[in-house]
Amino acid sequence: MAKAKFERTKPHVNIGTIGHVDHGKTSLTAAITIILAKTGGAKATAYDQIDAAPEEKERGITISTAHVEYETNNRHYAHVDCPGHADYVKNMITGAAQMDGAILVVSAADGPMPQTREHILLAKQVGVPAMVVFLNKVDMVDDPDLLELVEMEVRELLSKYGFPGNEIPIIKGSALQALEGKPEGEKAINELMNAVDSYIPQPIRATDKPFLMPIEDVFSISGRGTVVTGRVESGIIKVGEEIEIVGLKNTQKTTCTGVEMFRKLLDEGQSGDNVGILLRGTKREEVERGQVLAKPGSIKPHDKFEAEVYVLSKEEGGRHTPFTNDYRPQFYFRTTDVTGTIKLPFDKQMVMPGDNATFSVELIKPIAMQEGLKFSIREGGRTVGAGVVTRINN
């Protein structure tokens, strides 16, 4: 049989397994690929292939992540699985592997554990929109009352962290039985994928979001005006549309009078394009790197926010010492550094290298931001942390 060419006819969704160490995340990932491979929806990938996750660098941070892909009747999935707890924390905070949804794996024999809680909290903080639960290792539990108790605990925990605990599908099964080819194991995997297909919402495509482009460079072209360059982050910009210049200074309105890519003139630029945009009546000194061009009214500048942050360990090239309240590093948003002051919660004296923490920040200049925006923390040009805006405070 000739090899089928990969055609993107199905909608694409990014997903990942989360949960406590040894509850069976990697076994489940392997089981999904092996079961879906039977219908040609995946390449069967063994446990040890996934477990030997390659290291990747994202914003100066080394993260081990395994990627597999598979498809159901309805969708194409890219699935990420991490070997260690620290990799999950880093992955979710840096957004190295964007998650449109998650499969929370909980061992029925152990119930929710500390990392179960931490992963649910992180998923909430970084804006993972939905999750489905796989109650694993049910073959090790003889008592149906105990299973029911664990399910109740999981639902309560999800509700506590702001997920709809009563609605979330919980599938009971055994990844090991699925890997061994037992019918009840296989049935549970198929049930799980049906739940993922129907419960995890289709992500909004970047082109359907409001236009936004971080400014990387500004040029003056004699006789034509000011051109700003950058990579369109979301949406579409058409010639003749009104746009706003947001961040660092007062918001200004202008009009796009030209879009250029690879020295060719276009009618529009869309997310992912590296473009130059000609601005009507805007002077060279009125725009700078670090601002953004955006659809009017779609984004506002802010200087106070709360964040979930991973602080690099000394081994990762981070700080050698903890930092305390009023620490003033640089916050790198999109294309620029802005100095800010960190305010720790009253019950936290210091943050150690290698920790993840929640704290508030006040920047010296406002930046165009929305919840979910990622940033790096830098000190003297080196990255010492990575974070995500969880709440805007002004």
From Swiss-Prot:
Subcellular location: Cytoplasm
EC number: 3.6.5.3
Pfam families, A to Z: GTP_EFTU, GTP_EFTU_D2, GTP_EFTU_D3
Residue ranges, annotated region (G1): 19-26
Catalytic activity: GTP + H2O = GDP + phosphate + H(+)
Binding site for Mg(2+): 26
Residues covered by the tr-type G domain: 10-204
Region entry G4, spans: 136-139
Function: GTP hydrolase that promotes the GTP-dependent binding of aminoacyl-tRNA to the A-site of ribosomes during protein biosynthesis.
Family, as annotated: Belongs to the TRAFAC class translation factor GTPase superfamily. Classic translation factor GTPase family. EF-Tu/EF-1A subfamily.
Protein name per Swiss-Prot or TrEMBL: Elongation factor Tu
Organism field: Rickettsia typhi (strain ATCC VR-144 / Wilmington)
